[in-house]
Amino acid sequence: MVLIRVLANLLILQLSYAQKSSELVVGGDECNINEHRFLVLVYTDGIQCGGTLINKEWMLTAAHCDGKKMKLQFGLHSKNVPNKDKQTRVPKKKYFFPCSKNFTKWDKDIMLIRLNHPVNNSTHIAPLSLPSKPPSQDTVCNIMGWGTISPTKEIYPDVPHCANINIVDHAVCRAFYPGLLEKSKTLCAGILEGGKDTCQGVSGGPLICNGQIQGIVSVGGDPCAEPRVPALYTKVFDHLDWIKSIIAGNTAATCPL
């Protein structure tokens, strides 16, 4: 059964379609404390998600991570022993991809957030670059987050875990996710042999390829990390014009999901 990776049935009911709990990183190791300066820990209505800082005032996450009360934490590694330069923000404004009957639910799983106050670059905080071009098949990419590290149990680590996965032929995902269009605004990524994947607690986090954010954690198999069941990531490159337009102040073409 396909579920968007979130932690609560409440959000599943709110979105009105089957989704998987917020993802974790299965099969990974603790991230180096200096390799995730852009990574955001998102708490929203009791749900844990991830996000990505793209400049001092803006960040990206998944639309299905939206909630009434969102707390955004920057510069975090250990949740129990926070870095001294950790900063906390809340959304000033949230933007969703424009409504369109030409796109599936997966194509629209992106949220652009303007922070209530800009964050300051520091030892553990810095933005990640937007993509200059889309990744090609077989590109090795990185996933990361504080999500559960077990495909069958909710075991949440104190520190973020990282793993490498590959961009997979989109036909593999179309075979597993009914209704996924050939020209979908998504990326298919994973390890076809299984063993490495995002899972509960990492929805909205980044798929990083060649030092750029290429994807946003969206949908995956249940349980996680199964063979021949790669995950779907919202394709950031296909939303670039919209992202840049919003940041530039053109908000006319948006509507809530």
From Swiss-Prot:
Start and end residues of each Peptidase S1 domain: 25-248
An MF annotation (GO) of this entry: toxin activity
Glycosylation site residues: N102, N120, N121
Record has rRNA processing as a keyword: no
Sorted UniProt keywords: Disulfide bond, Glycoprotein, Hemostasis impairing toxin, Hydrolase, Protease, Secreted, Serine protease, Signal, Toxin, Zymogen
EC number(s) reported in the record: 3.4.21.-
Domain of life: Eukaryota
Residues annotated as the enzyme's active site: H64, D109, S203
Tissue specificity field: Expressed by the venom gland.
Entry's Gene Ontology cellular component terms: extracellular region; secretory granule
UniProt key word Phosphoprotein: no
Cross-referenced CDD domains: Tryp_SPc
One GO term of the biological process aspect: proteolysis
Top enzyme class: hydrolase
Signal sequence coordinates: 1-18
Cross-referenced Pfam families: Trypsin
Chief site of localization: secreted
Intrachain disulfide bonds: C31-C162, C49-C65, C141-C209, C173-C188, C199-C224
SMART domains (UniProt xref): Tryp_SPc
Propeptide: 19-24
Family: Belongs to the peptidase S1 family. Snake venom subfamily.
Subunit structure: Monomer.
Function: Snake venom serine protease that may act in the hemostasis system of the prey.
Name used for this protein in its record: Snake venom serine protease KN10
